[in-house]
Amino acid sequence: MLIEFFNGFVKVTGWPAQKLIFRTKIYYEDKQAQGRHIRGGAMVVSNHTSVFDYAAYLFVFFTRTLRVQMAEVLFQKQPLGTFLKMMGGIYVNRDTHDFSFMRESEELLNKGKVVGVFPESRIPKPGEETPLPFKPSAACIALAARKPVIPVVTDGNYFGKGRAHVLIGKPIDPRDYADPERPEKENIQALTDAMRERIIELERLLDERVNAKA
């Protein structure tokens, strides 16, 4: 409850500033299938362009509290680490074999919460092909919780003279990839591949939508 309250406070007080910083234009693959309001438990998966992706999505999905998986390095910086804990950030230690973040994410989904994941696990470096290969943990969690996966892409155009652009895609049902005749590892890989392919498709669609308005 405290996490929801703190998120609400941050979003209400930060609304004027984000209008200047992000000026986000939101597009939809199919608004009837999935709009900005997320009903029930769901996982939001996105490409990763900047440390500000999380901040932008707080306001894109204004009506829900995003419990986002975050790298250990962010929690090591103060006072940022304390702030992220208060916002409900899910601690992910990429340097160890601690998978407690997966259990925590699944539990949150089963409680009807919204979990945010950047499956690339880091921001791509200049010159790298994007999106980077997806880590399998997101698919593993989605298959276990059997909650919809909402693919979202951003162009990361923050702080510029233009505006940020975000496209919300149609949900992916992980149950479509839970084939009892296949080994679990193959199901996880199939969903991982499907999520990455959808992000690539949505990046192309977002580029088309933005350029059509130019």
Where are these regions (language model features)?
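Short amphipathic alpha-helix with an adjacent loop that forms part of the alpha/beta core around
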Residues: D30-H37, E106-E107
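Catalytic core of membrane glycerolipid acyltransferases/transacylases, capturing the structured
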Residues: R36-T96
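Short, flexible loop segments at the rims of nucleotide/cofactor-binding pockets, characterized by
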Residues: A17-R23, V44-S46, Y91-D95, P126-E129
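Non-catalytic C-terminal accessory region of glycerolipid acyltransferases
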Residues: L2-F5, M102-A214
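Glycine-rich, highly charged phosphate/nucleotide-binding loops
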Residues: K25-Y27, T96-S100
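A transmembrane-helix-recognition feature enriched in membrane-embedded lipid enzymes
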Residues: M1-K31, Q78-M87
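Residue-level detector of flexible, active-site-proximal loop/helix-junction positions
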Residues: K31-A33, V73-F75, T96, G156-Y158, ...
